[in-house]
Amino acid sequence: ERTHTGEKPFECSQCHKRFTRDHHLKTHMRLHTGEKPYHCTHCDRHFVQVANLRRHLRVHTGERPYACELCASR
């Protein structure tokens, strides 16, 4: 519902950016605190968001899940 109304009741106390969901604010706050709870088991990299860790892991696995629509190259 908030998506359609534009309501963003959750505000960052540091930079005043606003969010529709409380968990989006919690994730955002890690940018200010420097907390990076997701770490790569293959190297020393740490990440704020788990999605960024998953994308990074492809460096180690060689996975290339997206194919080019024009030439099918990955």
Swiss-Prot record:
InterPro entries given in the database record = Znf_C2H2_sf, Znf_C2H2_type
**Localization per record:** Nucleus
Task: Please give one Pfam family short name.
Answer: zf-C2H2
May I have one GO cellular component term? nucleus
Key words, A-Z: Developmental protein, DNA-binding, Gap protein, Metal-binding, Nucleus, Repeat, Zinc, Zinc-finger
One GO MF term attached to the UniProt entry: DNA binding
Zinc-finger is among the record's keywords = yes
Q: What does this protein do?
A: Krueppel is a gap class segmentation protein.
Q: Which family does this protein fall into?
A: Belongs to the krueppel C2H2-type zinc-finger protein family.
Its recorded name reads Protein krueppel
Instruction: Give the gene that encodes this protein.
Output: Kr
